[in-house]
Amino acid sequence: LTAFLFVASIPAGQATFVDTVEAAYLGAALETQDDRMPPDRMQGVVSIRDSIRLAGWRNNKVFLSEVFQPHNWPAKYDMTLDHNIVSMGEQDFKLYVTTDGSPYIIDVSSCDDTKCTPVVSIDTPLPNIGCRYANASVMTRHGFIYASTMGLVLLTGTGAWHIITKKWFGE
């Protein structure tokens, strides 16, 4: 494993530097070597309350920033879903992800150095028909609501879903 260690501060106008610093006098290792900038062309960003972490998406990929480092989006947190993402909301450290197929609920409180678990996939096709419009879905105290081909869908933190307009509108 290679690490970049601090050797010296060099003035901006200095063209050369000869490294004669002994290993015992080297500074700390660079802690940002594995940092990654936010992925290009993210289509949306959601703030995860109380953890100072961000979540975003592009096509069918979910991206998470490091906790307390909104500038750092490590690849180790990247997740690929089966369908393209339309919208995302957050409540109680759960990401509600609607797609052009089935919705997902991602528990981001359990993210460690390798992955976030569990990712709950709702097996019923409930595509979001919000046409990628940011205000076509809403987070409420009861869960995440969005428009699907079956009516307004309410997703709860347990993974349960309900068509809340079913009694007023038939199929």
Predicted regions: what they are:
Residues 57-77, 107, 111:
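Beta-propeller domains
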Residues 1-59, 72-76:
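Disordered, low-complexity "stalk" and linker segments at domain junctions of extracellular
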Residues 5-10, 21, 57-58, 66, ...:
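Glycine-rich, histidine-containing beta strand-loop boundary motifs that form or position
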Residues 2-3, 26-30, 69-73, 111-121, ...:
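Beta-strand initiation motifs
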Residues 45-62, 66-67, 81-84, 91, ...:
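Carboxylate/His-rich catalytic cores and anion/metal-binding grooves
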Residues 82-171:
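Beta-sheet-dominated scaffold domains
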Residues 1, 5-6, 61-63, 87, ...:
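Ordered hydrophobic segments in well-structured contexts
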